[in-house]
Amino acid sequence: MRIKIKDILISSKDVKFVGNIKNIERVVSFYSLDSREIKDDNINDSLYFAYKGNKVDGFSFVKYLIDLGVKCFACSREHESECIKYLNDNEGLVFLLTSNVIKLLQALASFLIEKTSFKRIAITGSNGKTTTKEMLYSILSKKYKTYKTWGNLNSDIGLPLSILRVEGNEEYAVFEVGVSYVGEMDLLSQILKPEIVIITNISYAHMQAFKELQAIAFEKSKIIGKNIEIFVVNEMNDYCVYLEKRAKIANPNVKIVYFDFENLSIKSFSFLDGKFSFDFVYKGFEYSILLLGRHNIFNAIGCINLALFLGMREKEIKEGLIETAFQKGRAEILTKNGYLILNDSYNGNMGSFMALKNMILDLNIQNKKFIVLGSFKELGELAYKTHKDLIQEAISMNFDKIFLIGEEFLDVRDSENLVEKCLYYFSEFDKFIDFFLKSLEPSVFIVIKGSRFNRLERILNIFR
């Protein structure tokens, strides 16, 4: 969205303008915390947030960006003297000084969202957020001008950045919302103020922070605020009734839309030359998704019911589903150098692993099967049990070789004496990859699964 510097000053009480007063009328429309995102086509319109992270201090790139041609910066007050020095050499610069760069980003997003007229849709849940977002965006785009969160900008930093990147003239905006610590959803809900909320499911994820499922359900439910008009909920989830009550407390007139599976019939699954299609009939109309996994049909039904409620026709919905562009690393089927590869390396929790198990059963692979499992993170006290369960589930799936990467798996091996001949343990990726290369056999089916932390997509490099 386009905004004048003078309006940014209104968005927060904790911001100080440093620059020539005439530049207060300057307009910005591209917002970034990553200097690499600033290119020739957005230099003149950029506002760079010089955020100090755990590894990199964004202020260290300010001089480089000034030389590149960027004019506007949000910086910590501790850098005021340096900013003034830069300003003495270039009076066209604007510095917005604040005690907390990220809080300024969040305040600006909250301020600007109030200026928009589009319907704000929030999608959250333990699994399926990104896939559901992509499907709903593709469907709505068949009839309405629609925006979506790009990538997985869904956190206390990513969501406000995603909000700032809308054009402002959309009819619907679909935002993915994720949490990794207690209280994060309070903040995200206050920033976004969604009118339509979809909760895909409640299952084990981020257990280090939340300890138990009830705590996850409570945290996720905080996305439901007083602005809610429509609530879409999976009626198969154990917390459906609880979430529905929360929605009705927030707004007694809220419209409830269910993931209703009574009228669902899975017609066929086809897999040919690395391409697949799930065909199903729902409420008498035939749909298809080009994505592996029956659980994705369930998420598609949530999107279908919401789209129908919003006045879309079945034909439009069908076209939107079939045209959905899905992200890499999420149930992605690849054929490389004669190998069939199922790459599900982006997300690691027990719920997504069980969904993966069903995908593999649907594929009905007759060739030899290898699986590479990277350890799952943020499990807290459940880490040991989860990794033990993972090993046992993998064994039950009759893989010919199971490659396990991470100290968590080694702990289970040593305590449980799990040393079956199909199991191969490695403390880290670098110790695994050479052994894996030597283990490959022609035409083997390879499954890759792990947390984003593991960066298991690096395996794909050996097939190029």
Swiss-Prot record:
Pathway: Cell wall biogenesis; peptidoglycan biosynthesis. It catalyses: D-alanyl-D-alanine + UDP-N-acetyl-alpha-D-muramoyl-L-alanyl-gamma-D-glutamyl-meso-2,6-diaminopimelate + ATP = UDP-N-acetyl-alpha-D-muramoyl-L-alanyl-gamma-D-glutamyl-meso-2,6-diaminopimeloyl-D-alanyl-D-alanine + ADP + phosphate + H(+). InterPro entries: Mur-like_cat_sf, Mur_ligase_C, Mur_ligase_C_dom_sf, Mur_ligase_cen, Mur_ligase_N, MurCDEF_CellWall_CoF430Synth, MurE/MurF_N, UDP-N-AcMur_synth. Gene3D superfamilies: Mur ligase, C-terminal domain, Mur-like, catalytic domain, MurE/MurF, N-terminal domain. Keywords: ATP-binding, Cell cycle, Cell division, Cell shape, Cell wall biogenesis/degradation, Cytoplasm, Ligase, Nucleotide-binding, Peptidoglycan synthesis. It holds the Pfam family Mur_ligase. GO terms for cellular component: cytoplasm. One of its GO terms (molecular function) is UDP-N-acetylmuramoylalanyl-D-glutamyl-2,6-diaminopimelate-D-alanyl-D-alanine ligase activity. It is found in: Cytoplasm. Its main location: cytoplasm. ATP binds at G125, S126, N127, G128, K129, T130, T131. One of its GO terms (biological process) is regulation of cell shape. It is an enzyme of class 6 (ligase). Its EC number is 6.3.2.10. Belongs to the MurCDEF family. MurF subfamily. Involved in cell wall formation. Catalyzes the final step in the synthesis of UDP-N-acetylmuramoyl-pentapeptide, the precursor of murein. This is UDP-N-acetylmuramoyl-tripeptide--D-alanyl-D-alanine ligase. It comes from Borreliella burgdorferi (strain ATCC 35210 / DSM 4680 / CIP 102532 / B31).
